[in-house]
């Protein structure tokens, strides 16, 4: 069985990771500009000031996409490029950049898929509380609707947010991403304000009969209980704790998006641990219920699985620790586990109302080297091949999977890791900005031809 007719083969990037031009043509400062310019936040002090210089090289990059043969390109718009202060004053030059990019894509037969928020909040909004401030819902709405209304005739697929988990928890609990806050309660406020922002925009699109599809992208990680220890019987409490820890990664986001409520068991546990108060939980549930609206599709970013076991001395909010099974790992230290993608897709199909799904990111970082002007990234080719197979198997088993976007089109700024991790199927020499097509580029090009 090959992939269904019209299956959307694509590649993905994000504004801060590739654009550069951080303060050009009227762009405002974003939280990632601020965060990377502060010493000690990013490996080797790297920043995205120039990144892949896509802002000046978009024509070259679109011609590479055309050569690759992708049907769609997923990218994000930089809020601070359009509203330098987060709201109010509109920067026309910022809009003109996206006008050009979208026109180039359409002219080359590539469907633009736009992510409205991929982590680069205007710093001016962070100064008044950012995602933890309930007012953000209105600021985001103003920005999102401006972009949707401007491009609705050319852009038919919209993603409200990329990875709310990372925005909330990496940015506001673990503090390893911008804005670098370390407070679980604040992170939960962020989760909630993102959900309300998502609903408000989806509702406006539907109520105004705007002829587009709109969804959200969640990074989901299937969690497996480590049971392979000899003669070991798993107790009920162990199973429950591993399950609750999984809900913090997955259901905390999936449930409100697809069912209109947060997982109550998880919230009760957090109240019991004094990480939330019960009145707040009631308000959260009530507001999600009142504002809920079902999206047109779900985007899933999948990279690896998580294997966990019970450990009451873990010191984490759950008595759980992570196991690292023997096997193949990428440069990010992530296990290569394509079966996890299949398991995840089947679980969503069986646990949630039916919804079209796109894999909006999947890929791997390896230590790529240029040899004779080529990059022989055989491990990435294998990684992609195995995950395409898992996707195909899921479709065969009734999953309504409509498309797949490789992460990433091009090597780029990998957040806290700076430029040390390469995910692209196109290599970038950051000194010269020269692009080199990796072996995985040619593999993907051929695969698309054979499966379209």
From Swiss-Prot:
Subunit relationships: Monomer. Homotrimer.
Active site feature: 163, 361
PANTHER family xrefs: GLYCOSYL HYDROLASE, LP05116P
Pathway(s) annotated for this protein in UniProt: Glycan metabolism; beta-D-glucan degradation; Glycan metabolism; cellulose degradation
Domain of life from the UniProt record: Bacteria
Biophysicochemical property: temperature dependence: Optimum temperature is 75-85 degrees Celsius using p-nitrophenyl beta-D-galactopyranoside (pNPGal) as substrate. Retains 100% of its maximal activity after incubation at 75 or 65 degrees Celsius at pH 5.5 for 12 hours. Retains more than 80% of its maximal activity at 70 and 90 degrees Celsius and less than 50% below 60 degrees Celsius. Half-life is about 11 hours at 80 degrees Celsius and about 1.5 hours at 85 degrees Celsius.
Homology family: Belongs to the glycosyl hydrolase 1 family.
Entry keyword set: Carbohydrate metabolism, Cellulose degradation, Glycosidase, Hydrolase, Polysaccharide degradation
Full protein name: Multifunctional glycoside hydrolase
SUPFAM superfamilies according to UniProt: (Trans)glycosidases (SSF51445)
Signal peptide range: none
Coiled coil: none
Keyword Cytoplasm: no
Biotech / industrial applications: Potential to be used for bioconversion of carbohydrates and biomass in industrial scale. Its high lactose decomposition activity makes it applicable for the removal of lactose from milk and dairy products in food industry. Has high activity in synthesizing galactooligosaccharides (GalOS), non-digestible prebiotic food ingredients, from lactose by transglycosylation. In this process its excellent thermostability mitigates microbial contamination. Has high ability in saccharification of lignocellulosic biomass such as steam-exploded corn stover.
Keyword Hydrolase: yes
Enzyme class: hydrolase
Organism: Caldicellulosiruptor owensensis (strain ATCC 700167 / DSM 13100 / OL)
GO cellular component: cytosol
Amino-acid positions noted as binding substrate in the UniProt annotation, renumbered to this chain: 17, 118, 162, 303, 407, 414-415
Activity regulation, short description: Slight activation by Mn(2+), Ni(2+) and K(+). Slight inhibition by Fe(3+), Zn(2+), Co(2+), Mg(2+), Cu(2+), Na(+) and NH4(+).
A Pfam family it matches: Glyco_hydro_1
pH effect on activity, per entry: Optimum pH is 5.5 using p-nitrophenyl beta-D-galactopyranoside (pNPGal) as substrate. Retains 80% of its maximal activity at pH 5.0 and 6.0, and 20% at pH 4.5 and 7.0.
Reactions the enzyme catalyzes: Hydrolysis of terminal, non-reducing beta-D-glucosyl residues with release of beta-D-glucose; Hydrolysis of terminal non-reducing beta-D-galactose residues in beta-D-galactosides; Hydrolysis of (1->4)-beta-D-xylans, to remove successive D-xylose residues from the non-reducing termini; Hydrolysis of (1->4)-linkages in (1->4)-beta-D-glucans, to remove successive glucose units
Biological role stated in the UniProt entry: Has high beta-D-glucosidase, exoglucanase, beta-D-xylosidase, beta-D-galactosidase, and transgalactosylation activities in vitro. Has a very broad substrate specificity with the highest activity with p-nitrophenyl beta-D-galactopyranoside (pNPGal) as substrate. Active with pNP-beta-D-glucopyranoside (pNPGlu), pNP-beta-D-cellobioside (pNPC), lactose, pNP-beta-D-xylopyranoside (pNPX) and cellobiose in the order of decreasing activity, respectively. Very low activity with soluble polysaccharides synanthrin and locust bean gum.
Single biological process term from Gene Ontology: cellulose catabolic process
PROSITE patterns: GLYCOSYL_HYDROL_F1_1, GLYCOSYL_HYDROL_F1_2
Classification via InterPro entries: Glyco_hydro_1, Glyco_hydro_1_AS, Glyco_hydro_1_beta-glucosidase, Glyco_hydro_1_N_CS, Glycoside_hydrolase_SF
């Amino acid at each position: 069985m090959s992939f269904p007719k019209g299956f959307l083969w694509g590649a993905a990037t994000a504004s801060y990771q590739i654009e550069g031009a951080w303060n050009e043509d009227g762009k405002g400062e974003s939280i990632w500009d601020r965060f990377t310019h502060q010493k000690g936040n990013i490996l080797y002090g790297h920043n995205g000031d120039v990144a892949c210089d896509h802002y000046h090289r978009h024509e070259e990059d679109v011609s590479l996409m055309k050569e690759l043969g992708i049907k769609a390109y997923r990218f994000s718009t930089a809020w601070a490029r359009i509203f330098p202060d987060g709201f109010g004053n509109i920067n026309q030059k910022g809009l003109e950049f996206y006008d050009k990019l979208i026109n180039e894509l359409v002219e080359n037969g590539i469907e633009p898929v736009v992510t409205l928020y991929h982590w680069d909040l205007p710093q001016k909004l962070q100064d008044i509380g950012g995602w933890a401030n309930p007012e953000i819902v209105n600021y985001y709405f103003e920005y999102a609707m401006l972009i949707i209304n401007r491009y609705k005739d050319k852009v038919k697929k919209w993603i409200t947010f990329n990875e709310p988990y990372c925005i909330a928890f990496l940015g506001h609990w673990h503090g390893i991403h911008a804005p670098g806050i370390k407070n679980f309660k604040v992170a939960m406020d962020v989760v909630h304000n993102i959900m309300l922002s998502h609903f408000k925009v989806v509702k406006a699109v539907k109520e105004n009969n705007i002829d587009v599809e709109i969804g959200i992208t969640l990074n989901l990680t299937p969690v497996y209980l480590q049971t392979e220890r000899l003669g070991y019987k798993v107790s009920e409490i162990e199973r429950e704790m591993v399950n609750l820890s999984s809900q913090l990664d997955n259901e905390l986001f999936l449930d409100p998006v697809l069912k209109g409520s947060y997982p109550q068991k998880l919230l009760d546990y957090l109240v019991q641990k004094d990480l939330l108060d019960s009145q707040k939980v009631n308000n959260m549930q009530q507001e999600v219920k009142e504002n809920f609206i079902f999206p047109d599709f779900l985007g899933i970013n999948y990279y690896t699985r998580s294997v966990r076991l019970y450990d009451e001395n873990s010191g984490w909010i759950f008595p759980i620790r992570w196991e690292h099974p023997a096997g193949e790992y990428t440069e990010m230290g992530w296990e290569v586990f394509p079966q996890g993608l299949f398991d995840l897709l089947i679980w969503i199909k069986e646990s949630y109302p039916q919804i079209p799904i796109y894999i909006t990111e999947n890929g791997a970082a390896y230590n790529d080297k240029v040899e004779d002007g080529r990059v022989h990234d055989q491990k990435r080719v294998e990684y992609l091949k195995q995950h395409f197979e898992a996707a195909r198997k899921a479709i065969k088993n009734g999953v309504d999977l409509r498309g797949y976007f490789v992460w990433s089109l091009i090597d780029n700024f990998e957040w806290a890791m700076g430029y040390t991790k390469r995910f692209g199927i196109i290599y970038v020499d950051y000194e010269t900005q020269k692009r080199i097509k990796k072996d995985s580029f040619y593999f993907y090009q051929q695969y698309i031809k054979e499966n379209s």
